[in-house]
């Protein structure tokens, strides 16, 4: 049996089907563009899904692909096994041939057998096939084409050999081909109890799409039958390289050996698994970034972060003290960049993201590992780590749950998933609408039904902190239920009346407890639906709760009081801003929490330190004067005539609540407030910033949180004094000296950057690409300032007459574009136009400059992967 490289296996598969009139279709992005139910492309057929369902027509009816695929979440979550088993991967390549109403079962089986036994030279006696137990035509074709006897054609009754796209749609039986690695490896034939062992390995799966599932009872024949096949490249290569572990094939071994040369730890024992994890996760991370995903804390970005951080933890286990992953990228690009050019195009961007993420995680990784070691000192084999510790590792140290599980795996310690999930839910679902999810339209109807039946909720919280109420509705998973009896279940509760304030008018909702006939219910949030239904978001802590029961509803008084003081302070702040900044100041938004307030206003410039001091002094003076705070219900028109402030664009009922604070403030407001301004205690602005053109944001704290802030700042000052080995009287002088030294170092750095960008004529020739007599030098660089880039680019265009220089510098959250054109060709190429087009392409607002030199900006880092194509289009045209 001939030994093939990974590249040869891929190439031979594609070449074979191209020779048989299949169109070679390039791999699609890992991000599905036609299936919102999928997080990632996980098989070759995904990009053809609409073709199979008849929603899309292509110019061809036969196709062959090598599709990059990823499985690391949801149904196909292989992450915990990756690196520890022989065939689990996050990223893998799926080879496939497809027929859309052209050839069917017999021809598909012929192609499979012909390619395996003739092109790949697999011994026929090593091959077994499975079919769906009623698929007699497939059995007859295998006998006719391959000469297989009945004992080599295994009939499977389970759905493993019957594929469907869902409850309805195209479906059909499958036929799988297995390779026998030999008696020396343990395992049984498909359909036996030992089928999941390593002797008999599935190498190819064919789906014969011959039916359409109409409903559970009805299945009809399709008029045009289709074929969908998949062969895992890594599995097939392992067979053809005579190894029983995918990580032993040439592609992985080259990455592993390259890694070993850097970390200097031998590839054996436990280290072997770490090398495999890193090799696999390097591929997954790099391809995801190339396809536009960047690490984040949600969705696809979080899957990427989980993969990257798992790899980084294994790099740490190998003793890597500095970022490692980005150093391995050139080897991956060398191995796979030709077949997947997006890797080459995005190489510098991928490298930057890998390095940044590893630097970011390094500190918290070490601290988190220290915490985990401390918390598991007393845990024995078979023990369970508390959900609280797992959540702290996740929330404080950035440890994905599966990373914590991976670390504990070798010690046979598990994690309390239930406890972890409870803490996750408490954190995630404090926002008012987080529970809506994908059932929003269904939920809307549910709330309309509730309002129609029960009317609005009566709010008692202006005068009461607790009240006896009747439970009129319980909602779980967007469905009305009669009772809740599972402890720690989350649900929504509606009463006929309540002292709990529902989030509105910028004020967050109340928290507290509900008691009813032996039950205890924690309220973790309160909000409004349809403006008048007050909804309590609850967790059952004890007993059970039924519709129709009377219950005692108790708000958290301290939490409410902190909301009151911050809300009243917001009104005072608004009035003081009118006095100091002018009557033209209009509120653009606000948020009142139990720990701070946020207030947005229209204002054309930054508020000065002097103005901030004046604002604080006047607000605190009003607080000290202990003015009475009163509320009155008035007709909206009358309130506005009396000078009450109403928010522009806000809808008000005919009658409104008006809050008056002494002679200082008069506003329409439905929120809760203190009785006297002295209850606020004190007021301190903690930040002032721009959030949009002409919009400023002020954040402030009140009462006990001012004391807390002073203590924190005092502690920080003492820490700084200690670090600088000085006292507060000499601290400013010390800082000025450091800043002056920093300026000197920056000048030296600028000189170094300029020198690094300076090229000889010979170097320019080597680093440029030429088309129609024009040389293009394109470089992505780090965070180098525009002045240096401009000078460097101009210097180069003075050396060569037909040169266009384009630098793109990566800033923290933006891109900087510098374009220079040799003066001899400025009649044909304008640097200002090129810079403007590149800026618009990269999400900027355009730019400009002279014909020979121009600069602009952008912020679309993802689109940077397509910049070469855009740049050449500008030059060629």
Curated annotation (Swiss-Prot):
One of its GO terms (biological process) is negative regulation of DNA-templated transcription. Keywords: Aminoacyl-tRNA synthetase, ATP-binding, Cytoplasm, Ligase, Metal-binding, Nucleotide-binding, Protein biosynthesis, RNA-binding, tRNA-binding, Zinc. Binds 1 zinc ion per subunit. The keyword Ligase applies. It is an enzyme of class 6 (ligase). Zn(2+) binds at residues 567, 571, 669, 673. GO terms for cellular component: cytosol. The keyword Transmembrane helix does not apply. InterPro entries: aa-tRNA-synth_II/BPL/LPL (IPR045864), Ala-tRNA-lgiase_IIc (IPR002318), Ala-tRNA-ligase_IIc_anticod-bd (IPR018162), Ala-tRNA-synth_IIc_core (IPR018165), Ala-tRNA-synth_IIc_N (IPR018164), Ala-tRNA_ligase (IPR050058), Ala_tRNA_ligase_euk/bac (IPR023033), DHHA1_dom (IPR003156). Pfam families: DHHA1, tRNA-synt_2c, tRNA_SAD. Its EC number is 6.1.1.7. GO terms for molecular function: alanine-tRNA ligase activity; aminoacyl-tRNA deacylase activity; ATP binding; tRNA binding; zinc ion binding. It comes from the Bacteria. It catalyses: tRNA(Ala) + L-alanine + ATP = L-alanyl-tRNA(Ala) + AMP + diphosphate. It is found in: Cytoplasm. Its cofactor is Zn(2+). NCBIfam families: alaS (TIGR00344). Consists of three domains; the N-terminal catalytic domain, the editing domain and the C-terminal C-Ala domain. The editing domain removes incorrectly charged amino acids, while the C-Ala domain, along with tRNA(Ala), serves as a bridge to cooperatively bring together the editing and aminoacylation centers thus stimulating deacylation of misacylated tRNAs. Catalyzes the attachment of alanine to tRNA(Ala) in a two-step reaction: alanine is first activated by ATP to form Ala-AMP and then transferred to the acceptor end of tRNA(Ala). Also edits incorrectly charged Ser-tRNA(Ala) and Gly-tRNA(Ala) via its editing domain. Belongs to the class-II aminoacyl-tRNA synthetase family. This is Alanine--tRNA ligase. It comes from Rickettsia prowazekii (strain Madrid E). The gene is alaS.
